[in-house]
Amino acid sequence: MATDAFDLKWGQELAAKIGPQIKTEISRIRKSPPLIPLVQSSARYEGVVPDYRVDPGPPARIKPSARLIPIKISSEFVLSQEQFTDEMLAAHLALRPAADLAYAEDAILLHGSRAETYLKGLNIRDENSTLGEQHGLFETAPKPLPADKSITDSIREGLEKLQKQLQHGPYCVIVSPDLHRDAITPNGTSTTPKIAPVLPELRESGFRFSEAAPQRTGVIFSIGGGALDMYIPWDVHVECRKVEGSATFVMVEQFRLRINDPRALATLS
C-alpha cells in the first residue's frame, strides 16, 4: 500500500477492525451480567438524555421534558508510521486504554462529580467537561465502616433501610476490595463465607467489588421498578482522530447513570 493511502479513512477502517477485540477486554472488566441495567441508544453522541426520575406520588409521575447531561470520556493511543500495517500490534496497544476507560467508567458510576480524584494518573479525558454534572451511587463521599462493624450486619441494615423506603429488589451490593475479601473469608474453621447468610437476599451474582471504592466502603441498591440504569448513547469504541505523521486513536464512550428513584440507594454504614 502506498504511503499516501494511510489517511483518516484508513485510520477509521483500522479502528473498526480492532473495535471488537476491545469490547472483549471491556466486558472482562465490567463483569457480566452488569449490576446496573444498561439502556443502549443509537450509537451516536447526544447532548442531553431523557431524565426518568420518578416522583413517587401517588400517583407516580415523571416530569415532562426533563433532561440530563451525559459524560463522554476517552483515552488516547498513537501508532507510529512504522506500525501502520501491524493490526495485531494496534489491537494490543489499545488494550491499556480500554482497561483505563473501564476503570474510569466504574469510578464515575460510583462517585459521579467527585470521581476526578480517582482518575488522577490515568490517561482519561473528559471531552465535554461534564464530569461536574454527573451523579454517582455514592450520594456523598462515603465513610469507612467502623472497624468493629461486620459487612454482613452492614448489608442487613442497608436492606432494612431500602425496604422501609418501599424498595422491593432485586438488591445489589458493591464494596471495596478489602471488604469483599473479608466477606468471602470463611468463619473460623468453617468453609462457609461470612457473607453467606445475606446472599439469598441479593440478586444472583449481586455482590461485587470495585477498585474505585475506598477502603471499607460500599453501597447497596435496588434495581427493581426501573430505579436506576445506565443510559449509553454510544458504547465503548475506537475512533481515529488524525493521521499526521503518526496516527492518533482514542478509546471513547458516552454514558449517563440515571438514578430514577433516589430511595433505591443506601451507602453502607
Task: State where each predicted segment sits.
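Assembly/oligomerization interface modules of large self-assembling protein complexes
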Residues: 2-73
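Protruding loop/beta-arch "assembly-hinge" segments enriched in small, turn-prone residues
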Residues: 2-20, 240-269
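Alpha-helical scaffold segments that mediate packing/assembly in large oligomeric complexes
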Residues: 72-157
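Helix N-cap / beta->alpha transition motif
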Residues: 74-80, 174-179, 222, 261
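Short helix/loop capping segments that flank catalytic or ligand/cofactor-binding pockets
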Residues: 106, 182-184, 259-260
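Short, catalytically relevant binding-site loops at active-site mouths
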Residues: 114-119, 178-182, 256, 265-266
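Extended oligomerization regions of viral-like shell subunits
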Residues: 144-229
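Terminal interaction module
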Residues: 216-256
